[in-house]
Amino acid sequence: HAAEGYARSSGKPGVILVTSGPGATNTVTALTDAYMDSVPLVCITGQVPTHLIGTDAFQECDTTGITRPCTKHNWLVKDINKLSSILHRAFEVATTGRPGPVLVDIPKDIQFKKGKYVKPKEVKKKNGETDIKFNGKDKDIEAVVDLFRKSSKPILYTGGGVINSGPRATQLLRELVSLTGFPITSPLQGLG
């Protein structure tokens, strides 16, 4: 949960590093919480050596299977030369689109191997991944403005999506409140 707190307060992905078996299974609650609240986390778990996977070895568990429902994506690293690209991809998946947790499971024999580090390829961000993208059609936005005008007691109820959308979204919301004078309320996830 500390990594989740870090991610919530910093806007950067939190990182979790745990051992195999019980270390990995003890992350399920935090991963589920982060998944439900769209908090970017990268969880790196240990695993028994590759040749022991599936043999009920000491502290072996199906980490990727257990965490599939509570992560955006997970990986079992079977080749040391793919580790760097998987880690770069993990951070990308955790922080793009709807943010959320991902998991990288690294068997013990892979942890002790030497491999070649490969820098990530330059990824051109899609419009909206770093800046706010307005998807509304002009007529829909005009309809919302008209509803604001006609409302006798307008109130803005905003959620965690504003926080997750970044500082620019928060700034725009503050400007809207300042311009309109509308009262605003948020659930705990939207307080930032």
Go through each PLM region and give its residues:
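N-terminal alpha/beta PP-like core and its mobile active-site loop of ThDP/TPP-dependent enzymes
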Residues: 1-192
